[in-house]
Swiss-Prot record:
This is Nuclear pore complex-interacting protein family member B6. It comes from Homo sapiens (Human). Residues 332-414 are annotated as: Disordered. Belongs to the NPIP family. Pfam families: NPIP.
Length: 425
């Protein structure tokens, strides 16, 4: 049996009856295995005129006849042609019907969790509120994945597509951000868990960056806001910069200052004296029970409790005055007079004075005659030197130019002078 498949396009069906019959006959003749039965079916189509439709039900032979039905044999032939047409597009028809059925079912049985993949703000807010109220969806804090609260919860087709898109987007974002940032899960940081060596390395790198940032922030703190130890070291350096001869440098450390000053102890300040002489508030109770070593302060503490013995008074000038009233005073030496210089000193002192060169006498500032300073004169008082007057060329006396002499006269004069020299040697 030969299967006939003809593409019935609108352009093909719009032809006349005679033209349609001719084209069908040509098509049947081109078949490798011609069939006589098929030829009879095609030739029978030329007998009837299909006015209503191309292959319509109402077939009329003559214009006067009304409603004449075709024979069963012709209807069977028409069904065969339609089946041959449908077999060619069976897959396309089934695919279209399945898509229509799926879309129809989606409109009726919508998704349980409401994920429609839209990026609208209201839709996302509605989805989040709905999932939060009913408890259908939640995120695991450990795996960071979406989980279902109920075991019997079903996931629709849209949920699968949305979840797949979300995973792909998340993987792309991780690959993109891996070179820029290092993200560490919060539960790993709190519990101290490290799943892999890669996460451990990332965590150590993040800690190093955090410490470096803290150090940078500490360097930014002004000197007035730093620890009191640093301020105390600076005060010590400021107090000893004159005595030790060191230049004042505010960042001079305690160890360097101690080495440069020759290990001199710093002067006790008010704060240190208070902490040394009295008990600190942070002193534990065990230290209070044990006896403390003897110190200089013990005598000071005992003084208010017991009366002090009478101490001998220091010697004063009045004691000598009392003794002088009862004892006669010795003869006091005479004051120096002018006659002492007249007495001749011994010979040794005279020789020593002769050997010493006389010292130059120093003049006082008021005794030295200062050279008088030159008195400043005004510009109008100074006698200006007369400037030479410029003479014009016509007024200037022109000097007489020397006359030019001929060469012959000069030679004769020279010769006469030479002969005169020879004659009168």
């Amino acid at each position: 049996m030969v299967k006939l498949s003809i593409v019935l396009t609108p352009q093909f069906l719009s032809h006349d009856q005679s033209q349609l019959t001719k084209e069908l006959q040509q098509h049947v003749k081109s078949v490798t295995c011609p069939c006589e039965y098929l030829r009879k079916v095609i030739n029978s189509l030329a007998v009837y005129r299909h006015r209503e439709t191309d292959f319509g039900v109402g077939v009329r032979d003559h214009p006067g006849q009304h409603g004449k039905t075709p024979s069963p044999q012709k209807l069977d032939n028409l069904i065969i042609i339609i089946i041959g047409f449908l077999r060619r597009y069976t897959f396309n028809i089934l695919f279209c019907t399945s898509c229509l059925c799926v879309s129809f079912l989606k409109t009726i049985f919508w998704s349980r969790n409401g994920h429609d993949g839209s990026m609208d703000v209201q839709q996302r807010a509605w989805r989040s509120n709905r999932s939060r109220q009913k408890g259908l969806r939640s995120i695991c804090m450990h795996t960071k994945k979406r989980v279902s609260s109920f075991r019997g919860n079903k996931i629709g087709l849209k949920d699968v597509i949305t979840l797949r898109r979300h995973v792909e987007t998340k993987v792309r974002a991780k690959i993109r951000k891996r070179k820029v940032t290092t993200k560490i899960n919060r539960h790993d940081k709190i519990n101290g868990k490290r799943k892999t060596a890669r996460k451990q390395k990332m965590f150590q790198r993040a800690q190093e960056l955090r410490r470096r940032a803290e150090d940078y922030h500490k360097c930014k703190i002004p000197p007035s806001a730093r620890k009191p130890l640093c301020n105390w070291v600076r005060m010590v350096a400021a107090e000893h910069r004159h005595s030790s001869g060191l230049p004042y440098w505010p960042y001079l450390t305690a160890e360097t200052l101690k080495n440069r000053m020759g290990r001199q102890p710093p002067p006790p300040t008010q704060q240190h004296s208070i902490t040394d002489n009295s008990l600190s508030l942070k002193t534990p109770t065990e230290c209070l029970l044990t006896p403390l070593p003897p110190s200089v302060d013990d005598n000071i503490k005992e003084c208010p409790l017991a009366p002090l013995p009478p101490s001998p008074l220091p010697p004063s000038v009045d004691d000598n005055l009392k003794e002088c009233l009862f004892v006669p005073l010795p003869p006091s030496p005479l004051p120096p007079s002018v006659d002492d210089n007249l007495k001749t000193p011994p010979l040794a002192t005279q020789e020593a004075e002769v050997e010493k060169p006389p010292k130059p006498k120093r003049w006082r500032v008021d005794e030295v005659e200062q050279s008088p300073k030159p008195k400043r004169r005004r510009v109008d008082e100074v006698e200006q030197s007369p400037k030479p007057k410029r003479q014009r060329e016509a007024e200037a006396q022109q000097l007489p130019k020397p006359k030019r002499r001929r060469l012959s006269k000069l030679r004769t004069r020279h010769c006469t002078q030479a002969w005169a020299i020879r004659i009168n040697p």
